[in-house]
A protein has these predicted regions:
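Helix-rich C-terminal "cap"/substrate-channel and partner-interaction subdomain
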Residues: 326-422, 490-493, 497-532
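C-terminal motif of bacterial Sec signal peptides marking the signal peptidase cleavage site
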Residues: 21-23
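Beta1/beta-strand and adjacent pyrophosphate-binding region of the FAD-binding site
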Residues: 31-45, 61
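A glycine-rich dinucleotide-binding beta-alpha-beta segment and adjacent secondary-structure elements
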Residues: 185, 384-468
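Conserved beta-strand-loop-beta-strand element in the redox core of flavoprotein oxidoreductases
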Residues: 187-208, 214
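Glycine-rich loop(s) and the adjacent beta-strand/alpha-helix scaffold that form part
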Residues: 205, 209-278, 477-484, 489, ...
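Conserved N-terminal/central alpha/beta ligand/cofactor-binding core
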Residues: 58-59, 65-176, 180-185, 226, ...
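An anion/pyrophosphate-binding glycine-rich loop and adjacent beta-alpha core
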Residues: 255-257, 261-380
Length: 533
């Protein structure tokens, strides 16, 4: 690594992913590189790329605007994987072919090449790799789009997926870190990306960093609601209110830097939009959301009427929700269902206070002794709400939801809404994840608008839309998995390129202490290209 005076810090903590700004600067003079590879973003995909390159002996510099690592992963849940040891232990019979058919059917137009590669390699490339670093998966749960349970969770959610990878990265002497530094531009020389311009967020000073390759691992743009709506899928109405549910760093600055350097975008109108957002009471602007739910509740629109199957798939509920004006609904439930209300996120799992921060907060929840009073407080038509609850309760008594098919004869019907006090919580659609992004080839190299490789630039993780596997409709666990996979594959591509440039074998891999044995490459670039061709 070339000489520079940046302060590198190594410590294990949790945080948000990198945010960047756009632009590119053309360079002409020959400058000694600061690293062989610069990775922008210390989230799951960036750390995976760094560790894989570290094993190849590559000199890596990881740059992040925060003082800590973690990324959007800290808001995430689990990983979808196929035919894993944990599935086998639990008696879950699975196969690559079954997973491929499930996912292609669900996503409608997921990238078939990457889907095929993922289902055939997720065990080796993801499960075996992370468990070799100390990750422990403790449960596998069913999820939409899957005929068997494939959604793997660690104890303590995704934090326990990130930290072992981060600890591994910290153990490698050839990986350095530059914190509190915001990547703002890509450097170009004769059409090749050769580095970045970074701004020290504490001093305000800007510097250039040079490398043979740059890996952008900057995440999505789902915090930028205007950009989400400007790139909304054409056959769905745009919601008139959309809350923010992504990490604060998901501003799309990586997209801006890549496109300023000539990269193309692909599937940019694909978003994973949640339908269960409640305004965060801690946000004075009421633009950010918490994700919440109550499986026992009934939902009504602004007219006080049910409008969807509350137990349906998110993709169907979203289509129904964005057609409402306004694009909002109220969860209606009674006192017997209060304990069924939950808010996602570690800070909300247990609340020692006697007062619930949502249910006992008049700004977030309306509560009344009668449905008529509740309707008045929520701004809903009283007669319509009372009629909707009455019809709903009658269908529960009859054992069949003839309006929206939530339950059928023989199903366990939800409880009736009949015990005061009654609750109404207003809900909104929420941004979450990008399912499209920077266009890439089979080696994770960014492509320009002509489909040609943009030399020196790689895009991994959510920045490339999680490999396009999610297609039109997202799959649970199909964001963290592609983050790891794409980070590793980009690193393998770079290792092969650097080795070829030296006309010699790659440097010896660095052993990771948590591994049981000597590391072995799981695939070659030729294998990947043959599969994806």
């Amino acid at each position: 690594m070339g000489t520079h005076t940046f302060h590198f810090v190594r410590f294990v903590v949790l945080a948000c992913l990198v945010t960047l700004h756009s632009g590119c600067v053309e360079q002409h003079e020959a400058i000694e590189p600061d690293a062989q590879v610069i990775v922008v973003g210390a989230g799951l995909s960036g750390l995976s790329a760094a560790v894989e390159m570290g094993r190849h002996g590559i000199d890596v510099l990881v740059v992040d605007m925060n003082s800590v690592a973690g990324g959007h992963t800290m808001l995430a849940g689990g990983v979808a994987m196929v035919a894993t040891p944990l599935q086998e232990e639990l008696g879950i019979e699975d196969s690559a072919e079954q997973a491929y058919q499930d996912w292609m059917d669900w996503t409608r137009d997921g990238d078939a090449r990457w889907t095929r590669y993922y289902v055939e390699n997720s065990r080796e490339m993801i499960y075996d790799w992370v468990t070799g670093m100390g990750v422990e998966f403790v449960r596998v749960v069913p999820s939409h789009g899957n005929s068997v349970a494939r959604f793997h969770f660690t104890r303590g959610r995704a934090a326990h997926l990130v930290l072992p990878i981060y600890r591994t990265a910290l153990s490698m002497p050839n990986i350095s870190y530059l914190w509190n530094s915001q990547a703002q531009e890509l450097l170009l020389e004769d059409g090749r990306v050769t580095g970045i311009v970074v701004k020290n967020l504490r001093s305000g000073e800007a510097h250039s960093l040079h490398a043979d390759n740059v890996v952008l691992a900057t995440g999505g743009f789902e915090t930028d609601v205007d950009r989400v709506l400007a790139n909304w899928i054409s056959d769905l109405p745009k919601p008139d209110r959309l809350l923010i549910g992504a990490a604060v760093s998901a501003t799309g600055s990586g997209h801006d830097m890549a496109t300023a350097a000539g990269a193309a975008l692909d599937r940019i109108d694909r978003h994973y939009i949640y339908v269960n957002g409640v305004t965060d009471p801690r946000d004075p602007e009421k633009s950010h959301a918490l994700t919440a739910g109550n499986d026992d509740s009934m939902w009504v629109n602004a007219s006080g009427q049910r409008f969807t199957n509350e137990a349906g798939f998110d993709r169907d509920i979203l289509a129904d929700l964005v057609r409402q004006r306004p694009s909002t609904y109220w969860m209606i439930f009674d006192e017997t269902m209060r304990d069924s209300f939950g808010v996602r996120g570690a800070a909300w799992l247990k609340n020692a206070s006697e007062e619930h921060p949502i249910l006992d907060n008049p700004a977030a929840t309306k509560r009344a002794q009668s449905l008529g009073e509740l309707a008045t407080m929520a701004g809903l038509p009283g007669e319509a709400l009372e009629q909707s609850v009455r019809e709903y309760n009658d269908m529960i008594s009859a054992g069949e939801d003839t309006a929206f098919g939530r339950f059928s004869p023989g199903d366990q019907a939800p409880p009736k809404i009949q015990t005061a006090p009654f609750y109404a919580v207003q809900m909104f659609p929420v941004t979450r994840k990008n399912m499209g992004g920077v266009a890439i080839d089979e080696q994770l190299r960014a492509l320009d608008r002509s489909g040609e490789v943009l030399p020196g630039l790689y895009a991994v993780g959510e920045l490339n839309g999680s490999l396009g596997i999610n297609g039109r409709y997202g799959l649970d666990g199909m964001f963290l998995g592609p983050a790891i996979l794409s980070g590793r594959l980009a690193a393998m591509s770079i290792a092969a390129e650097l080795s070829a440039d030296r006309n010699a074998a790659a440097e010896q891999p660095i052993e990771i202490p948590a591994d049981d044995g000597e590391w072995q490459a799981t695939m070659t670039l030729a294998d990947l290209e043959a599969m994806l061709s």
